[in-house]
Amino acid sequence: VAMTGHDLFPWLSTAVPLMGALAGRIFCRDPHQLKTSCLLWSVLSLIPIAASDVAMPEGPLLLYLLPIAAAISLLGQPVHRDHRLSWLMTLVCLGLGIGVIVHQGVFAHLFLLALLATTISLLVHHHTTLWPISWWGIGLFGLAGVSVIMTAFTDPPISSSAAFLTCVVLIPLLPFHTGYLTALTRLPGNLPSFAAVLLPSVGLHFMVGMLPTIPITITGLVSLFALAGALYGAVKALAQTRVRLMLSYGSLSFFSVLWWFAAMSHM
């Protein structure tokens, strides 16, 4: 069966950043050219997205937001040899994130698993004395990966509960917020600033389809945890002296308000 344009563009949207990461290895010896290449590929990934016309319940904004966020995070990082891996991994994560949003069913789950596995690998291999390894945060991303598998191979209500667990890790909700905080504080280079947009965007895509299947009793608990998370995140953000932690807890407070709004709308 011939692949139509409607089928081709989602795959092309996913492939462009991944091809950019592969092509970028040519410039690994020259950090300036590598950064320029990664920037160009990030911008180029907007073209197939604009042409794909993929219909999504949450609208097309998330798809356009991801390449723009990737490009901005790359622009904000100074040229240095130590940042080469993070530039290439920005394109890899961009391709996987787009793949989660533009595809459906098993392909979306596979791309999300790959994104979670990539995040876990980066967190395991990149940590410093200032930011020691956080096994609790890594474990939460592992839990999200197991939940993705359960979502793909089980039926409701188990699949709905598994999808909910995935969402509360990607869009931080107390007490599952440590994974998001770990990504924003431990990932190398420019990846924390990109992950701050990528993870909630992917989670929001899943939340739109998941929330209507969650029982009212669960959404009531979500609203309570969301209010607690908003207060906790705000207080913790005010008490921080390190910028990454301040932004991380500020994000927790913001996304807790989003969870509260989503839960109350469902109720």
Indicate where each model-derived feature is located.
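Transmembrane helix-loop-helix hairpins at membrane boundaries of multipass inner-membrane proteins
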Residues: 1-88
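Structural signature of hydrophobic alpha-helical transmembrane segments
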Residues: 5-16, 54-66, 104-116, 157-169, ...
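Short hydrophobic alpha-helical membrane-embedded segments
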Residues: 11-16, 39-40, 62-65, 81-93, ...
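Hydrophobic/aromatic residues in alpha-helical transmembrane segments
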Residues: 19, 96, 148-151, 176, ...
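Alpha-helical transmembrane segments of multipass membrane proteins
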Residues: 20, 45-48, 97, 144-148, ...
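Alpha-helical multi-pass transmembrane bundles of energy-transducing inner-membrane proteins
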Residues: 24-36, 85-178, 237-267
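Short helix-boundary/re-entrant hairpin motifs in multi-pass inner-membrane proteins
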Residues: 30, 37-48, 53-54, 72-82, ...
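Transmembrane helix-loop-helix hairpins at the membrane interface
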Residues: 217, 221-223, 235-236, 266-267
